Amino acid sequence: MSNPLRLAFRPFALLYEAIVQTRNQLFNRAVLRAWESPMPVVSVGNLSAGGTGKTPMVDWVVKYYLSIGFKPAIISRGYKRQSKGVQLVSDGNNVLLSSREAGDETAMLAWNNPDAIVVVASKRKQGVKLITKRFAQRLPSVIILDDAFQHRQIARSLDIVLVNAEEPFVEAAMLPEGRLREPKKNLLRADVVVLNKITDLEAATPSIKALEEMGRPLVKARLSTGELICFSGDATTLDEPATAHHLNAFAFAGIAKPESFVTSLQHEGVNVGATRFVRDHAPYSAKMLRAIRRQAEEQGLCLITTEKDYFRLLGQPELLSIITALPCYYLKIAPDIFDGKALLQEKLNAVVHYVPKPEPPKKIEEPYRRW
């Protein structure tokens, strides 16, 4: 956004900040009280309006708890879902709702973590109550609240807040002047801050220094690209991972930061010959997908999209079938925590009172002796 335009929005940003801070003060002074869940709660959220890599981090936290023997439950708002109220997306055995009913990211989390309970609820408290009632005989070990830093109605044992390294933290401003939903100083509420999407440590240095000065535990991470998964043909059966190198592709997506998707593909060796992007969570139409398929056919390109977009289309098989006559792939991504991983794991362990077993000392073999 240009400087004159930002200045024009500044009065509205100041008004929005005043409203947000008034509400926060009501919680800080216990005028509004946070409800205590019967299960420990971990919140994964952010300060800005999307694009921080929050969903992959939720996925990482869920997988970590599963790896150490705990059963987590995820509660998400289910952004842009078509269902209403509180809905059970997965019971920890079966995925019960489509991406249209659950929301793109929530459906993706459910499919990628079949052992986790997943619920969508506009009011997260109602989601906790559904879990408590439905799974009274086997309560989950921990509740993971997706995108809940601003949702202070539920008390939490751990607040993890993500900051996008691609957006200079020093220059960040409140909506609508910038992308912040809360002032930067509110990071003091966080138990752990994750500076995510770091691609260049030198470029991220100003943000790192600013965050370190706030005195909160800081974790550094980047998004690591994983496999290219083929979903053409039978959309319910995924083939073996593809080799990205030398693929000529038409990239399409509906995400907050599509340019980072293209960069990831190019980094993996994909030749991106054409692109088509829509706004985050925008619906695909049959007309649009036919146009994408036609252009890809004319240019001899395969189709590549994001994992989130794949799961969005999976809930609409009539749309998915339009493109699957061509080779189609989606790109998996995951957080690569390269600094502070042990710290984050320690914080997550404390929530569920988990004490890792110490590694046995390595046996030192004596040198062979001749007698």
Curated annotation (Swiss-Prot):
Pathway the protein contributes to: Glycolipid biosynthesis; lipid IV(A) biosynthesis; lipid IV(A) from (3R)-3-hydroxytetradecanoyl-[acyl-carrier-protein] and UDP-N-acetyl-alpha-D-glucosamine: step 6/6
One GO term of the biological process aspect: lipopolysaccharide core region biosynthetic process
Molecular function in Gene Ontology: ATP binding; tetraacyldisaccharide 4'-kinase activity
Enzyme class: transferase
Catalytic activities: a lipid A disaccharide + ATP = a lipid IVA + ADP + H(+)
Pfam families: LpxK
Cytoplasm in keyword set: no
Record-listed ATP binding positions: S48, A49, G50, G51, T52, G53, K54, T55
Keywords on record: ATP-binding, Kinase, Lipid A biosynthesis, Lipid biosynthesis, Lipid metabolism, Nucleotide-binding, Transferase
Enzyme nomenclature, EC number: 2.7.1.130
InterPro entries membership: LpxK (IPR003758), P-loop_NTPase (IPR027417)
KW Transferase (keyword) present: yes
Gene Ontology cellular-component terms listed: plasma membrane
Summary of the function given for this chain in its UniProt record: Transfers the gamma-phosphate of ATP to the 4'-position of a tetraacyldisaccharide 1-phosphate intermediate (termed DS-1-P) to form tetraacyldisaccharide 1,4'-bis-phosphate (lipid IVA).
Stated family: Belongs to the LpxK family.
Protein name, per record: Tetraacyldisaccharide 4'-kinase
UniProt organism field: Chlorobium chlorochromatii (strain CaD3)
Gene: lpxK
